[in-house]
């Protein structure tokens, strides 16, 4: 990828929460979220505590106390695991803030994080490699904007368009478009992919990024992630946003993680399939479907539920839905 040098300056100058003493780094520095933790630490003169992985969360939590870590950047998978742990055995009093990216946190997870970390400021953000961090929710808005990833960071303009290129008003769903000096210049030696993702802006030489992500915006200008355009499920002639079904699943006590995909169905066109990781081994597929039936329209109902010990991940920590779709038979874990 070709990324302008101004990108790092915009993100660093914004600072966000990074007035820090010590930052714990779980993210691969070869991925943008991890790389910017390194740059931020240099910018503010902090200390970076490196972790190999989240395979041993108790050791990581112990190191937070030992090193007096003040900032913890994570992704939804990591926070879902933290919410299932007894944190009272660890000294986390030094933590001042948590940041989340890769995918939006379910509102129920944010509520639980607030309960388990009452003294910590939580930043819910959205970004992609092509534009880096793009949206953030001011922490003081968490209670009144549940599920939102906020507004554009300074120096960024963001809006929503329909397939015809018209800007949409609040309450409507469309593709997020991003404008700013931090939008990357293109994919290395891939002109067709570059042309599909980027279009000319109003200033000569400027590029707009068409993210491929569906959002809606409320009357206050706050953005809500709906899903990837290519993740939308077309079932019974209706469009189903997986994120809406996933939020319902996450609201069921005992569900640690959930991912929803569409699978071919000869009658429905596509059927909704839910993959669920449970924290409660007694939770059954039947109970999960009953919960969905009570909270979802018929066309959004999962045809089946597959229980998993864990969900496949991309290198950036997102759920790998392509891998989930690939397992057509999708047998449950033993």
Where does each model-flagged region fall?
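Gly/Ser/Thr-rich phosphate-binding loop
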Residues: 43-46, 66-74, 83-145, 157, ...
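AMP-binding/adenylate-forming catalytic core of the ANL superfamily
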Residues: 72, 180, 185-186, 196, ...
């Amino acid at each position: 990828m070709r990324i302008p040098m101004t990108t790092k300056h915009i993100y660093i100058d914004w600072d966000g929460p990074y007035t820090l003493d010590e930052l714990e780094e779980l993210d691969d520095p070869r991925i943008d979220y991890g790389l910017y933790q390194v740059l931020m630490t240099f910018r503010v003169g902090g200390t970076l505590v490196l972790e190999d992985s989240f395979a041993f969360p108790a050791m990581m939590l112990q190191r937070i106390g030992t090193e007096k870590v003040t900032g913890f950047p994570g992704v939804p998978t990591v926070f879902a695991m933290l919410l299932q742990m007894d944190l009272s055995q660890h000294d986390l009093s030094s933590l001042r803030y948590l940041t989340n990216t890769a995918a939006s946190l379910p509102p129920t997870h944010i509520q639980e994080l607030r309960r388990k970390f009452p003294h910590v400021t939580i930043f819910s953000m959205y970004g992609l490699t092509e534009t880096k961090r793009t949206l953030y929710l001011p922490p003081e808005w968490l209670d009144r904007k549940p599920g939102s990833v906020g507004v554009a960071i300074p120096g960024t303009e963001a809006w929503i368009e329909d397939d015809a290129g018209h800007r949409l008003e609040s309450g409507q769903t469309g593709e997020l478009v991003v404008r700013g000096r931090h939008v990357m210049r293109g994919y290395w030696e891939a002109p067709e992919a570059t042309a599909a993702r980027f279009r000319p802006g109003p200033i000569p030489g400027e590029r707009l990024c068409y993210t491929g992500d569906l959002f809606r915006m409320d009357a206050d200008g706050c953005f809500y992630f709906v899903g990837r355009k290519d993740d939308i499920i077309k079932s019974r002639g209706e469009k189903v946003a997986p994120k809406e079904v996933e939020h319902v699943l996450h609201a069921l006590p005992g569900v640690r993680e959930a991912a929803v995909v569409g699978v071919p169905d000869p009658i429905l066109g596509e059927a909704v399939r839910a993959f669920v990781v449970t924290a409660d081994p007694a939770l059954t597929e039947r109970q999960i479907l009953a919960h969905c039936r009570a909270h979802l329209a018929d066309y959004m109902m999962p045809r089946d539920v597959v229980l998993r010990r864990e969900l496949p991940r991309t290198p950036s920590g997102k759920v790998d839905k392509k891998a989930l779709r690939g397992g057509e038979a999708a047998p449950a874990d033993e």
